[in-house]
C-alpha cells in the first residue's frame, strides 16, 4: 500500500509539473480585446474584459498563440503574421497587439498556393522569375480593388533544402499580404529522426505547425499531417495530440459555421479509389454539423471532391508545374493557385493559371488531336467538380452535355514524349496521371465550328470556340 501511495504521489507531482500557469494580454490600438481565444497547442482559454488571459501551459508546449479574430490581423514579420510567441517557462508574460484589417468587413480573398518546392538555387531563381510575378499581379490587383487578401502556402515550401527557407519566405513577404504556412514532408529536416526535431527549421521561419485563425465568417485551421521518421520516411497522418486539440477547438465554434482545414497531404485521394486518411475521418466527425472544406497540396494535381455530405476537399495543383521539370502538372492542370473568396458569408473558389486571364478555365482539342478519341472534340476543365455543367454547340446550335471521360493529358503526354525522344531520363513522378475532368463530343461531318461552354457551381460561364476547317 505504501508503495502504491508513493507511486500515486509521484504521478500527481509529475502532473503538476507538466503545466505552468502563464498570463498575457490581447490589445488592439492599446485597448483591451475580450473573447480572443488563446492556446498552447494543448488547451484553450479566452481573454477577459480587460484583455487578460491566463492558461496552464503544458511543459511540452512550443508556442503560445492566438486564434486571430475575424476583422483583425497580427503584425507581420517577414510576411508572417505574429500571432504566436515561443513558449518560455521563464517568461513573465505574453502580450499581443492586433490591428484592424482594412477593407470591406467580412470580405477577403485567400490565395492557396501548393508546393513551390525549390530544391536548388536555379529553382529559387525560377520561383522569383516565373511564379512570383504572377502572384504579385494578383495581390496588386487586390490592393487596387481595396480587397483584403492573404496567402496560404500548402506545404513543401522547399524541397529538402532548409537553407532556402529564408529566401522563399522573403519572396512571399514581397507580396505585401499576410502569408500563412503549412508544413509539408519536404519541409522537415531529413537529417533528424524525431518529428519534433525535424520541424525545428520550419518553426524558426514560419511558427507553429498547427494553429487557427478566422477570416470573414470562416474558421481556418492549419494542421501538420506529416509524421516524420527521418531520412525522408514519413506517414501521412494527423497525430493524436492534434486531433484532440482540433476536437477541443470544434467545441468552441458556433454550430453550423464554416471550417476550412489546411493540411499538406490530402484527406481523401479520390483518384486512388477514394483512399482516405483515417485520422481525417475522425477530424470530419469532430466537426460534424459544420460546413467543412479541406485545402491541401502534395499530389501535384488538381481536384475538387465532395468526400461526404457537407465536406469538400480542394486538392491544389503544384504552382511550379511538376517539380520544376514540366510546364504543367502531371494531370494536365496549368501552373497556378486556387483563389478563395468570401463576402457577406458567400464562399467561392476559382483556379487561377499563372500569367493567364481568370477567364481561361478550359482547353479544347480538335478532332484528330487526341488519339483515344480521334473523331471527337475533347475539352479539359481542370477545376471541374460534380456541380459544373459542360455543354457544346455546333455551328451555334445547342447539342447538349458533353460526355465526361478519364484521360492522360494530351499536352503533358506530348511533352514527356518529346523528352524521351531527346534522350532525357524520365522520373517515375513524371508519368501522366489519368484524370476525370475531360469531356468529349463528336461533331457532324459538316460542322464548321464548335463552342464548349463550362459553367461552374457559382454560375460563372467559361467558353472556348474552335473552327473545324471545313470549306465549301
What are these regions (language model features)?
Residues 20-23, 27-42, 59:
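Short, ordered, surface-exposed loop/turn motifs in non-cytosolic proteins
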Residues 21, 28-29, 68-166, 446-449, ...:
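N-terminal active-site segment of His-dependent metallophosphoesterases
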Residues 36-40, 63-64, 390-392:
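Hydrophobic beta-strand segments
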Residues 42-56, 404:
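Short, acidic Ser/Thr/Gly-rich low-complexity loop/linker segments typical of extracellular
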Residues 70-76, 83-86, 162-255, 274-295, ...:
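Extended active-site neighborhood of metal-dependent phosphoesterases/phosphodiesterases
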Residues 177, 409-440:
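Aromatic sugar-binding surface patches on proteins
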Residues 250-271:
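Short acidic, glycine-rich surface-loop motifs adjacent to enzyme active sites
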Residues 311-395, 436-444, 449-465:
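Binuclear metal-dependent phosphoesterase catalytic core
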Amino acid at each position: 500500500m505504501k508503495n502504491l501511495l508513493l507511486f500515486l504521489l509521484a504521478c500527481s507531482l509529475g502532473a503538476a509539473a507538466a503545466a505552468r500557469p502563464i498570463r498575457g494580454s490581447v490589445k488592439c490600438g492599446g485597448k483591451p480585446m475580450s473573447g480572443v481565444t488563446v492556446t498552447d497547442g494543448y488547451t484553450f482559454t479566452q481573454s477577459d474584459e480587460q484583455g487578460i488571459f491566463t492558461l496552464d501551459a503544458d511543459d511540452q508546449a512550443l508556442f503560445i498563440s492566438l486564434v486571430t479574430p475575424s476583422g483583425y490581423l497580427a503584425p507581420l514579420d517577414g510576411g508572417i503574421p505574429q500571432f504566436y510567441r515561443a513558449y518560455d517557462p521563464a517568461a513573465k508574460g505574453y502580450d499581443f497587439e492586433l490591428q484592424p484589417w482594412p477593407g470591406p468587413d467580412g470580405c477577403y480573398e485567400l490565395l492557396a498556393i501548393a508546393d513551390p518546392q525549390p530544391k536548388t538555387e536555379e529553382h529559387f531563381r525560377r520561383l522569383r522569375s516565373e511564379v512570383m510575378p504572377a502572384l504579385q499581379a494578383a495581390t496588386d490587383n487586390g490592393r487596387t480593388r481595396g480587397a483584403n487578401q492573404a496567402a496560404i502556402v500548402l506545404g513543401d515550401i522547399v524541397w529538402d533544402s532548409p537553407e532556402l527557407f529564408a529566401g522563399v519566405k522573403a519572396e512571399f513577404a514581397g507580396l505585401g499580404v499576410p502569408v500563412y504556412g503549412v508544413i509539408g514532408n519536404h519541409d522537415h529536416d531529413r537529417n533528424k529522426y524525431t518529428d519534433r526535431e525535424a520541424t525545428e527549421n520550419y518553426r524558426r521561419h514560419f511558427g507553429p505547425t498547427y494553429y487557427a485563425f478566422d477570416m470573414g465568417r470562416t474558421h481556418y485551421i492549419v494542421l501538420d499531417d506529416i509524421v516524420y521518421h527521418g531520412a525522408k520516411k514519413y506517414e501521412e497522418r494527423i497525430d493524436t495530440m492534434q486531433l484532440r486539440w482540433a476536437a477541443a477547438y470544434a467545441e468552441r465554434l458556433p454550430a453550423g459555421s464554416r471550417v476550412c482545414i489546411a493540411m499538406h497531404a490530402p484527406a481523401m485521394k479520390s483518384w486512388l479509389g477514394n483512399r482516405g486518411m483515417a485520422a481525417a475521418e475522425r477530424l470530419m466527425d469532430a466537426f460534424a454539423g459544420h460546413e467543412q472544406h479541406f485545402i491541401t497540396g502534395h499530389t501535384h494535381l488538381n481536384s475538387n471532391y465532395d468526400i461526404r455530405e457537407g465536406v469538400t476537399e480542394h486538392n491544389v495543383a503544384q504552382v511550379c508545374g511538376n517539380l520544376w521539370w514540366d510546364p504543367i502538372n502531371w494531370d494536365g492542370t496549368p501552373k497556378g493557385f486556387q483563389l478563395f473568396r468570401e463576402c457577406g458569408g458567400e464562399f467561392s473558389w476559382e483556379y487561377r493559371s499563372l500569367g493567364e486571364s481568370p477567364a481561361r478555365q478550359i482547353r479544347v482539342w480538335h478532332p484528330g488531336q487526341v488519339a483515344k478519341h480521334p473523331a471527337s472534340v475533347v475539352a479539359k476543365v481542370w477545376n471541374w467538380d460534380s456541380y459544373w455543367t459542360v455543354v457544346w454547340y455546333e455551328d451555334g446550335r445547342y447539342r447538349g452535355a458533353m460526355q465526361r471521360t478519364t484521360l492522360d493529358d494530351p499536352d503533358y503526354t506530348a511533352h514527356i514524349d518529346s523528352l524521351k525522344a531527346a534522350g532525357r531520363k524520365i522520373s517515375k513522378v513524371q508519368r501522366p496521371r489519368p484524370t476525370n475532368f475531360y469531356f468529349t463530343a463528336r461533331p457532324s461531318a459538316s460542322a464548321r465550328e464548335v463552342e464548349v461552354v463550362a459553367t461552374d457551381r457559382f454560375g460563372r460561364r467559361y467558353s472556348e470556340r474552335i473552327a473545324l476547317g471545313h470549306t465549301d
